[in-house]
Amino acid sequence: MSKFNRMHLIVLDSVGIGAAPDANNFVNAGVPDGASDTLGHISKTVGLNVPNMAKLGLGNIPREQPLKTVPAESNPTGYATKLEEVSLGKDTMTGHWEIMGLNITEPFDTFWNGFPEEILTQIEEFSGRKVIREANKPYSGTAVIDDFGPRQMETGELIIYTSADPVLQIAAHEDIIPVEELYRICEFARSITLERPALLGRIIARPYVGEPENFTRTSNRRDLAISPFAPTVLDKLNEAGIDTYSVGKISDIFNGEGINHDMGHNKSNNHGVDNLIKAMTSEDFKHGFSFTNLVDFDALYGHRRNPQGYRDCLHEFDERLPEIIAAMKEDDLLMITADHGNDPTYAGTDHTREYIPFLAYSPSFKCSGLIPVGHFADISATIADNFGVEKAMIGESFLDKLV
């Protein structure tokens, strides 16, 4: 019998808690990540008021310098620690895959200066359409269609862009490039980005409609991902007949592997919390695991180096946390963590190599406090231990510490 009948894991995308031991091996605009500290710098520069996460023990997590505006709790209601990454990467897929028990020794490729000419030329030759070279760089998905949508409507050229993650995205106006044609082009792009030097996690079709200054992305998005190279704890749960719920982009990150209930994409963090609560309160979800990604911290504020917006986004989540806790059953476990850092005060615009926070809460807890500093994959091992399934590649369970 499971110690916790249901487990809920929320990833606050990019909410790191201080530079990892190997952070200087990773750079941002030529600056090593060794001084990065997402939560620390937000707390120091613009203030951070997250009383509900503080109650769980966020301010108790060991650091060289305590979080300036998040006090330690003398009697927290949950367990807390920080976790270190072992994989060779600081992107979303690497972080999530390791959290589910894999060690990624060959990092995905990211293209901060845009994709090489060879890839663009191959796509042009396959599609018979030119690629707008000026869009070929990391770009906001809404900004790129605002900037190049009018040109695409005139010329039929492809808008190809990327982000901080290992993705190639193709935006196409549905009246100019039909959705099925866009899908075929994306399938070709997927076929040429399966190995180094262009090993990409996802190819994303981004259809949109409308007129200049009023473009809207449609629900016809399609993600062409690659599956994890080995079974994750999601697969182990699924094979054992245990329900697994995806909220947000989790299903995309794992290419649907090991997911048997997909709550769909989130329009925002708040929408994601709504979807999580909908899953938690469903009569069908009696036993199993839910996995939620809330990406606004990263996508809207981290890459754009906006500490005020990042802070406000954290405040917004913290205000919703009591609703999530209210949806829990007595024998549920809630876990809150991250997948990498993205210090909005740091050099460059890329992710930062950081520890991630880990908070755990259950209404059934008799004790609380700190658990030993561990690794990302310890989360997956704890999930496997709880449900009595085989763990994935790496990770050590701390289930016995949660009492």
From Swiss-Prot:
Reaction(s) the record says it catalyses: 2-deoxy-alpha-D-ribose 1-phosphate = 2-deoxy-D-ribose 5-phosphate; alpha-D-ribose 1-phosphate = D-ribose 5-phosphate
Pathway(s) of this molecule: Carbohydrate degradation; 2-deoxy-D-ribose 1-phosphate degradation; D-glyceraldehyde 3-phosphate and acetaldehyde from 2-deoxy-alpha-D-ribose 1-phosphate: step 1/2
> What's the top EC group for this one?
isomerase
Q: Where in the cell is it found?
A: Cytoplasm
Functional note: Isomerase that catalyzes the conversion of deoxy-ribose 1-phosphate (dRib-1-P) and ribose 1-phosphate (Rib-1-P) to deoxy-ribose 5-phosphate (dRib-5-P) and ribose 5-phosphate (Rib-5-P), respectively.
- Where on this chain does Mn(2+) 2 bind? 298, 303, 351
**Family per UniProt?**
Belongs to the phosphopentomutase family.
Q: Offer an example of a GO molecular function term for this protein.
A: phosphopentomutase activity
- What superkingdom does the record give? Bacteria
Instruction: Name the Pfam families for this protein.
Output: Metalloenzyme
Its GO biological process annotations read: 2-deoxyribose 1-phosphate catabolic process; 5-phosphoribose 1-diphosphate biosynthetic process; metabolic compound salvage; nucleotide metabolic process
The UniProt keywords, alphabetically, are: Cytoplasm, Isomerase, Manganese, Metal-binding
Q: Write down what this protein is called.
A: Phosphopentomutase
Q: What is its EC number?
A: 5.4.2.7
| Naturally occurring in which organism (per UniProt) | Streptococcus thermophilus (strain CNRZ 1066)
Lineage of the organism: Bacteria, Bacillati, Bacillota, Bacilli, Lactobacillales
Q: Name one GO cellular component term.
A: cytosol
User: Record-annotated residues binding Mn(2+) 1?
Assistant: 13, 339-340
Named cofactor requirement(s):
Mn(2+)
